[in-house]
């Protein structure tokens, strides 16, 4: 398998992140009054609401909604005046209700951006050929472009909301590449599609088998104390181009959330987790390739190394004439590889519809 630097000379990686953050500053769960603590005895902090028993009605946590508004303002998002909760159906043991309460097309915060400064070895990871003269622009123009998109798309979204009852996507084809400075550093605006509220799933412990991995465990135990924990999920547009950019974005977002006081953002404890979506395309092409989603990126190093491996793996498959399938893969840091977890679900598989409760 080729090295990452060699692969990125011929292939362009297209990366988007889904970052889940537990609102650890709160005392109770998202839709009930159960204590928010993962250190108690397993299944000690549960009730009919978080277990989805018949007749139990959820009540939104006001402080959780205030926290997501703070996060949206800090990331230059447009705060929506009207939003809805939806049911996202899937059948895994860590979700007792067989659906997750989340948000649909209209989230609490949408269409923001963060400017990402990339310097030193991180800047060197992105090849010079990614910055053609025809694409280059000044740092000030790049930032203004992102801000202009944020303003123009807000107007478009409002019009779409009146016409179709939901927010449509926006065209960002005019978002250009950044210009590399003399020292090799550059700044790139990373667009944020949405920040929405959802409840966390239960914690699963995989026992036995080789190194206790999910793929070889003898049995799995479920602790529902974490079920119903308020989460915010931030979804970026696929604007990241290297594993180092993804790592730096995650670090910057963590600093923002810690400063806001909405979460401790401890990746060791799992209060901040990241899923990476990555695809490849030949340099100069505009059509996106087939993406894979990476799980178990539970540290900054795992985020970088997992994405780097997957980029090299996809390049090897494509260069040998193979096909990349849309699937969810699990990063195994001990073996430094990704393995298939499941074929990726589509939106139809989730049967998303407004939560009547």
Model-flagged regions — what are they?
Residues 130, 134-136, 142, 146-148:
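Low-complexity, intrinsically disordered tandem-repeat tracts enriched in small residues
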Residues 2, 145, 149, 158, ...:
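Surface-exposed charge patches in extracellular/virion surface proteins
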Residues 142-147, 154-159, 173:
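Low-complexity, intrinsically disordered segments with a bias for serine/threonine
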Residues 1-133, 153, 163-357:
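Basic, nucleic-acid-interacting segments
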């Amino acid at each position: 398998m080729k090295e990452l630097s060699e692969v990125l000379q011929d292939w362009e990686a297209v990366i988007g992140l889904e970052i889940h953050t537990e609102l650890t500053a709160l005392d109770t769960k998202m839709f009930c009054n159960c204590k928010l603590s993962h250190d108690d005895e397993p299944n000690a902090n549960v009730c009919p609401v978080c277990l989805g028993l018949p007749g139990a009605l959820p009540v939104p946590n006001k402080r959780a909604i205030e926290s997501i508004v703070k996060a949206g303002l800090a990331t230059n998002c447009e705060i929506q005046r009207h939003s809805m909760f939806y049911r996202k159906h899937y059948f895994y043991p860590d979700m007792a209700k067989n659906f997750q309460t989340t948000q649909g097309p209209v989230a609490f915060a949408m269409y923001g951006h963060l400017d990402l400064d990339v310097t030193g070895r991180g800047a060197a990871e992105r090849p010079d050929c990614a910055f053609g003269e025809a694409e280059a622009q000044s740092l000030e123009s790049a930032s203004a472009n992102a801000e202009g998109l944020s303003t123009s798309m807000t107007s478009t979204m409002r019009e779409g909301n009146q016409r179709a009852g939901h927010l449509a996507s926006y065209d960002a084809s005019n978002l250009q590449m950044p210009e590399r400075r003399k020292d090799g550093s550059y700044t790139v605006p990373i667009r944020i599609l949405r920040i929405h509220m959802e409840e966390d799933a239960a914690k699963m412990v995989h026992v036995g088998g080789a190194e206790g991995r999910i793929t070889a465990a003898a049995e799995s135990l479920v602790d529902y104390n974490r079920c119903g924990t308020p989460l915010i999920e931030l979804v970026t547009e696929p604007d990241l181009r290297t594993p180092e950019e993804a790592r730096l974005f995650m670090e910057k977002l963590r600093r923002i959330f810690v400063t806001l006081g909405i979460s401790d953002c401890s990746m060791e404890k799992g209060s901040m987790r990241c899923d990476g979506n990555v695809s490849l395309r030949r340099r100069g092409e505009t059509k996106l390739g087939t993406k894979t989603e990476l799980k178990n990126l539970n540290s900054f190093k795992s985020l970088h190394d997992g994405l780097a491996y997957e980029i090299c793996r996809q390049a090897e498959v494509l260069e040998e004439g193979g096909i990349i399938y849309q699937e969810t893969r699990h990063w195994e840091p001990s073996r430094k590889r990704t393995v298939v977890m499941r074929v990726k679900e589509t939106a139809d598989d989730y049967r998303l519809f407004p939560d009547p409760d």
